[in-house]
Amino acid sequence: MDWGRFVEEKVREIRETVGDSKAIIALSGGVDSSTAAVLAHKAIGDRLHAVFVNTGFLRKGEPEFVVKTFRDEFGMNLHYVDAQDRFFSALKGVTDPEEKRKIIGRVFIEVFEEVAKKIGAEYLIQGTIAPDWIESQGKIKSHHNVGGLPEKLNLKLIEPLRDLYKDEVRELAKFLGLPEKIYNRMPFPGPGLAVRVIGEVTPEKIRIVREANAIVEEEVERAGLRPWQAFAVLLGVKTVGVQGDIRAYKETIAVRIVESIDGMTANAMNVPWEVLQRIAFRITSEIPEVGRVLYDITNKPPATIEFE
């Protein structure tokens, strides 16, 4: 791929499409939205408004990381929106995975439209990539930036990366000068930790899975492993364990670590036993609500990478 030519073409397309108007971008800090943001910033400069929505479903330290990186280091117009209560309220009592994704997508776009009106933006730029719309089209699962979009969107949509796969986006991000901490980040689902909690999403469940997820990422990095994704899932199943001399019913965490090139297929990683033991020990020691840790050895297919 000639990335120089690709960037020239996309910058020209965005500039011609947006004209003298303003645009907002769904910025999450992941490689997809970050790369789309840099492309758009090259095209329209200060008329790009990066909107970061704290859904309450983000990784540990994510809000601080995004603000520091894009406001302080890249000098972008960054609008921080704390919408945690709104998302938790919308998901109250919801257990169906597909419904969860669609609700998150709907609320996400509602928040954007509100910010866009204040800014006077007419365009919404998203970091949608090929696997997102392929899986949505094939009815495998809805992606919040595809299937969750309302039919009557009040913003005109621009998706400059929609024909690229994840490995290509990483190459493009590197070409654009994004730091390694961005272009080598593991993929993170648009709905965030909400799809790593099986069943109803609550602040308490998110707190547990967020801590477990951080431990998995830390131990994988410490071991020098380079998986496609490594994360924790709260299964919503309590099992019996022993605490001192008494029986205790505690939560169960599943650990998922996979290798892949583009996310369309994936293999469970053959992780050294001592790494898995360390992960299990830390999760059960540092998160008192968890009493059992499982390792998922299923490939994609038949399973998807995420549990929901």
From Swiss-Prot:
Top-level EC class: ligase
Catalytic activity of the protein: XMP + L-glutamine + ATP + H2O = GMP + L-glutamate + AMP + diphosphate + 2 H(+)
Domain of life: Archaea
Gene3D superfamilies the record matches: 3.30.300.10, HUPs (3.40.50.620)
Keyword DNA repair annotated: no
InterPro entries in UniProt: GMP_synth_C, GMP_synthase_B, GMPS_ATP_PPase_dom, NAD/GMP_synthase, Rossmann-like_a/b/a_fold
EC number annotated for this UniProt entry: 6.3.5.2
Involved pathway(s): Purine metabolism; GMP biosynthesis; GMP from XMP (L-Gln route): step 1/1
Keywords: ATP-binding, GMP biosynthesis, Ligase, Nucleotide-binding, Purine biosynthesis
Positions contributing to ATP binding: 28-34
One GO term describing the cellular component: cytosol
MF term (GO), any: ATP binding
PROSITE patterns linked: GMPS_ATP_PPASE
Domain GMPS ATP-PPase, first and last residues per copy: 1-185
Function: Catalyzes the synthesis of GMP from XMP.
Oligomeric and partner information: Heterodimer composed of a glutamine amidotransferase subunit (A) and a GMP-binding subunit (B).
Protein name: GMP synthase [glutamine-hydrolyzing] subunit B
Gene name as annotated: guaAB
